[in-house]
Each structure stands twice: as C-alpha cells, then as structure tokens.
Regions:
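N-terminal accessory alpha/beta regions
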Residues: 7, 17-155, 188-192
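Active-site substrate-binding loop specific to GH73 endo-beta-N-acetylglucosaminidase modules
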Residues: 83-92, 105-109, 141-385, 495-496
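Basic side chains
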Residues: 121-123, 208, 318, 437
Length: 496
C-alpha cells in the first residue's frame, strides 16, 4: 500500500475515491487536526452521492433534545393512561419519530464518517467517544450524539482536562451511570427521605468509572474510600431526562417542567445541572487530594485526575494500541507520555505525537468493524446509507444505520459495558465477526453500487502483490470486491 493510504488506513478513514492525494502525508495528517468539521451527508440516496452539510433543522441543540425527550415520555404516560389521541400505533410511531433522536443521530454519525473531509479528527473522535463510553440505556439516546459532537469533537483541540470535565458532566454520562438520582448520605435530600420513611442515597457508578476507566486506572491503587469520595463529589450532578418526579400522573408542559427545573437546580441547562439539596456537605479526599464542598469541587477533582501520572500512562497506552500497533512498544507509549507531560495535556500535541508515532511505526493496525466499514464505503465510492430525508422510507436492500451497526456488531448507541470496545484485535478475530465483514462487503457491492472497480481501487491504494493475487484468483467482480475489502491488507492484519 502506498504511503498516503497506509497512513489514511492507520489513522484515518481512507481518501474518498475522487480526492487528490497529498504529497506530504505527514504534514497533511497533522493539518487534519484543525480541519473544519461540518456534519456532511446526503439528503437522499443516489449513485456517487456527494456530501452536503446537514441542515440545522435535523441537528437540535441540547435544550431542544431535552424538551423532545421530555415530551416523548409525557406522551408515553398519556398513552398508558389511555388518553384519546395517544394509544394508536400511528400516534406511538409519530411520538417516536418526532421526539427520539437515536436513529437520526446514528445516521448523522455514519454520514460524517463516510462523507467527512476531516477523517483524522473523526477517528480521534471515535477513540474518545469509546474511552468515555455512554452506552444506550434508552433514556439517554437523545444525548449520545450530542456528547460525541459537542463534548468530544468540539473539544479535540483543547486540553484533556476540559474534555474530561465536559464528558463527566454531560447528560448522556450522568444518565448512563445513574448519577442523576445520587445524593450524599448527609445531604438534605437524604435527610428528608429518611424522615419520610423513604430511601435515598449515594450511587457510586460514575465515581468508580471516573477512576477506573476514564482516568487513573486500577494501577493507581485507589481504595473503596476513594471511590466513595469521588461519588460524593459527583452527588447532586445531573437531571434525569423526561419525567422528573415519581408522581404517578405527572403531566407537565415544557414551561412547567422548566419552572420545576429552575427550582431544583437553578437552570434549565442539563449540562450544568447541580442540585444543592443532593450534595454531600464537607470536604472529600480522593487519592490524597482534598476536594472542597459545592459545585466547584468536581472541576477540581477532574483537573487533578486529568494530570495524574497514572492517567497519562494509562491513556497513552490506549492511544498507542488504537492507532500505532496492537502491541505497542514501551518507546511508542513513552513518546505519547512525553508529549502529554510537555504540553500539560494539550490534545493537539498529544494527537500530533500519536500521528508521528503511527507514521514511523511499520507495525500493522487492525481496524474496528465500524472503521473498516467506513473505509470500504469511502474507498469504493459506494452509497450505502440512506439520506437524512429518507428516515421513514423503505428502501429495498438498504438498511437503516441502526440496523447496519447492530448487524456489524459495533455501535456507540448499543447497550454496552462502561469499558467500551477493545482495540485489541483478538477481541474481533472470531469466525463470526469475519463472516459479518464478508456479508457487508457483499451488500456494499450489491446495494451500494461502488463507483470504482477492484482493479481501480488496488491501483489507487498501491495494493501489495499478495492482495492482488488474492483478488485476481476470482473472476466475478463482486467476488473480487469482497476479497479485496476483506483482505489482510485492508483489515490491517499484515504490513501494508
């Protein structure tokens, strides 16, 4: 594989079939960190479609998403109560179509990765979206896509400490790990609950994952006391999407809900929602760091954890394993660690170090199923996803984005564990997972109508002789396409 495509395969999503190739691929790769990132996609399916920017009307902001999901939940309550106009199948579908964002956001994510001109930024976005996993528990489906776009992609050129804070406080994370209900054992909310004979207390899910997965990792040898104290720092953060009380017949208008939110947290902004009545009073100690009481304590905690030695070492290894090699060397990891320390966590400098190390490394890098899928579609010029204007239209042979990701076996909108998807190829090399790639390569050829032939693709990428021999052992163009896209070279199993 030529140098341009070797780097685009390892660090990006492959050049689109009609994109000129850069002469200085290293300079191009580093410049990609500051590429513009509009959400590009297609309105309707057509052969050799060209990406255009998604309209604002299908990209609601966070408050609009909150209001939509709240309305969805209240309409579901009206349905349960048997109210006229809410119980028919048409009404149920209309409620989902108008107020749920999960399926549309998955299509937008697919479009970005297929038509985007910021391929390296999108790969780093996927890495961090996986690092800060927020699996779909239904009630956060309106927020997962927003977190990816606004907490991660929008902050790729900033500092890791800022991204950590923005993801920790995002509705998607606070909902996913049940922090919205958490309250300190000595909080006013807990006292009131005990007086009423009810239960209210601390949930340590997010406190635990903040230490174990998002920052220092178990190598820091934190204790259960550290986890509990981190959870106490987090107590009070977040508001559950949708209906906001357990009252059986609560049916609030948007205005009434906002009034209630302001009373509870002083704001209607779910990304800055802190309930003082749920907060644990007093200072807390986490890994020796004393954290003050109140809303500002969380920023002090995340800043401390972001610059911790164990955080730097742990995430540098993850970056190296994801982009450089399945088995990164100590020098690979240290190169990223040194860039992190010298820049005090500046993501531009960290990502530049990753790029430099990936380019200098001759090791192959196996690609995730979703990364491979996007690369195949981009390389071939196929049109494999519906347009944003076709969400409710049946297109024979073209699955919805949600169905594609489910069948592929990887999606940021799946129900999944907080540790996310592994970057280790051993987790993806089963016969079943390989058979899925064969099926998708077949479907992309048969239903996506690739613009380029297998021979044209091999010439453009500079495929090696082993790959060419494999492809040429078949006579049918479809079989050649499948063999090429599922070859060890294109999957990242052998040196390109």
């Amino acid at each position: 594989m030529n140098e341009q495509f070797r780097i685009a395969h390892k660090l990006g999503l492959m050049f689109l079939h009609d994109t000129p190739l850069p002469e200085d691929v290293k300079a191009w790769a580093i410049s990609q960190l500051h590429a513009k990132s509009p959400a590009l996609g297609i309105k309707r399916w057509k052969f050799n479609a060209i990406g255009k920017e998604w309209p604002k009307s299908v990209q609601p902001n966070l408050l609009e998403r909150d209001n939509m999901f709240s309305l969805y939940k209240y309409n579901r309550k009206r349905e349960e109560m048997g109210l006229d106009g809410y119980t028919s199948e048409a009404a149920k579908r209309d409620n989902e179509r108008k107020n749920l964002m999960g399926e549309l956001d998955q299509l937008k994510f697919a479009h970005r990765n297929v038509y985007g001109e910021d391929q390296l930024k999108l790969r780093f976005t996927a890495f961090w979206a996986n690092h800060f996993t927020t699996g779909n528990i239904w009630d956060n489906q309106n927020h997962i896509g927003h977190a990816i776009d606004e907490a991660i992609l929008a902050n790729l050129n900033g500092n890791f400490s800022h991204m950590l804070y923005k993801m920790t406080t995002h509705s998607s994370m606070l909902t996913y790990l049940d922090n919205c209900w958490s309250c300190g054992e000595n909080s006013q909310e807990a006292i009131w609950a005990r007086e009423d004979g009810q239960q209210a207390g601390l949930n340590d899910n997010l406190g635990r994952e903040l230490l174990e997965l998002h920052t220092v990792s178990p190598t820091a040898k934190y204790t259960e006391s550290d986890i509990k104290n981190a959870a106490n720092v987090l107590a009070g953060w977040g508001i559950w999407p949708g209906r906001i009380s357990g009252e059986e017949h609560e049916l609030l208008s948007t205005e009434q809900r906002h009034t209630k939110l302001r009373k509870m947290g002083g704001t209607i902004n779910s990304w800055d929602f802190f309930k003082k009545d749920h907060a644990e009073p007093g200072t807390k100690r986490v890994l020796g760091k004393v954290i003050p009481a109140g809303k500002g304590g969380l920023k002090q905690l995340t800043d401390f954890l972001a610059s911790h030695e164990h955080t730097i070492n742990y995430i540098s290894f993850k970056l190296a394993q994801h982009f450089v090699s399945d088995n990164p060397s100590k020098s690979d990891i240290n190169y990223i660690v040194n860039a992190w320390k010298k820049s005090n966590g500046n993501l531009d400098q960290i990502h530049t170090a990753v790029i430099e190390r990936a380019i200098s490394s001759t090791e192959p890098k196996f690609q995730w199923p979703m990364t491979w899928l996007f690369q195949v579609v981009r390389l071939s010029g196929a049109t494999y996803f519906k347009g944003w204007d076709e969400m409710d239209k049946y297109n024979q042979g073209i699955m919805d984005a949600r169905e594609i990701f489910e069948e592929l076996g990887q999606s940021f909108w799946h129900e999944r564990q907080p540790n996310g998807y592994s970057s280790d190829k051993k987790e993806w090399l089963s016969g079943e997972m390989f058979e899925r790639r064969i099926r998708f390569a077949d479907a992309i050829y048969s239903k996506g109508y690739p613009y380029s032939t297998p021979d044209e693709i091999m010439d453009r990428i500079g495929a090696n002789e082993t790959t060419r021999s494999l492809v040429n052992s078949f006579t049918r163009k479809k079989d050649q396409f499948i063999a090429l896209m599922c070859s060890p070279e294109l999957m990242g199993l052998k040196n390109a």
